[in-house]
Amino acid sequence: MTTIPAIDLMGRLRSGNSTAPRLTWYGPDSERVELSGRVLDNWVAKTSNLLQDELDAEPGMRLRLALPAHWKALVWALAGWQLGLETVLDDGAADFLATDDPSGAGDQHDAVIAVALPALAMRWTGELPAGCLDYAAEVRSHGDVFMPHSDPDPSACAIRTHDGRTILHSDLASGFALHHSEGARVHVPADHGLESALANALGAWQHDGSVVLTHADVALTDKLLADERIHGS
């Protein structure tokens, strides 16, 4: 099987010290979500299976993430990457759209997926546009292990950055991820944007580190930094 950095990363996250925290989210209304490597891999596998089995996603297709920097947005990016999809962060054309605001999605995508951001949401609150998929209601029914139907292409585009760089799947770890020291526990402000959150998270995870992602409404106190043991760079 052809491998790419995203697949290798998910393998590392679910093996070794798989119960250690890898992604911690602080959101509005005192929301705190912590995902170990094993739990993060589980969410990513289920999301990849939803894309592949329910939406017929294949390597080379494009997945637009109209989402803020949030733990579920990181899950979606990883799910797309291990499938070999291109992640689109701007308003460019895409086969699939994952969004927290499906009301204005239009009809230019093969599928629109509504992503409810609250951690405990079991389904979308309110009405959805016709044909829109409810991520919270659907994702839990999908398998915990992802087995790709087709090999990803390492030379295909994984993401285009805000400054116009094209990052191939083969270069996701070396050309997009930001470098962090071994085992670092990195704080990432969500208001720096999703691209920053993804680059920082990939850089931390590939060196056995972890990420604390905080919403702009969350006060970054000395107690929070101490409780989360933020360290390294």
Regions found by a protein language model. Give the residues of each.
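A short N-terminal helical cap/helix-turn-helix that marks the beginning
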Residues: 2-23
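Alpha-helical oligomerization segments
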Residues: 3-4, 24, 185, 209-210, ...
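Conserved short alpha-helical elements in the N-terminal third of ANL/AMP-binding
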Residues: 79-82, 197-211
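Short acidic low-complexity segments
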Residues: 85-94, 101, 216
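ANL superfamily adenylate-forming
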Residues: 96-180, 221, 225-233
